[in-house]
Amino acid sequence: MNEINRSPDLEMVVLKEISSAIVNERNGTALLRHILDVLYRRMKMLRGTFTIRRGNDLMIEASHGLDEQEMKRGHYHVGEGITGHVAETGRPHVIEDISRDSRFLNRTRTRKSGEKVAFICVPIIHLQQVIGTLSIDRAVDRDTDLERDQKLLEIVGNIVGDALAASLQAHEERAALVAENEKLRELLTTNPGELI
């Protein structure tokens, strides 16, 4: 179970742990997972995701509380659902109870019917461009302050922008290398003389 501490210092504890992870973790996806782990332990987060924008699509890059199949289902178009709307507008969005909001798509199929859970989604911006989103499902009780949580997640999203941009760049470089290798294999197979 996550250890929630709603003291006035919660934000400082979360930011200190995340900034330490940013300094020490070089792998972008591992860093994003570490950040989600901090949010789980400190904020009553049930599930969380970082998405990366690729063209007009958003794909889950890292998650907490989702298995591989659920992550694969977490594919959105910009403008679609809450996550897509946040990516389109660059503005955060809070849903106090996802079971009562028809805009919430539950694409990953991880939410149970009737489960009272809040959803907070914030944009991740790098060089004035929305490059992804950070979203969490959060348990709600009488001490929940969703506005405070949203503000904290906005700060986290702002400081993670560079790391997510690096992860996006690594994906693009990897895709370019794979495409180049495929092209070379095809040339080698069909026209080996053209390689000389």
Where do the language-model regions lie?
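Regulatory loop-to-helix N-cap segments in sensory/regulatory domains
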Residues: M1-S7, D137-E154
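A short, aliphatic-rich beta-strand micro-motif
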Residues: V117-I125
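Allosteric cytosolic regulatory segments
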Residues: E154-D162
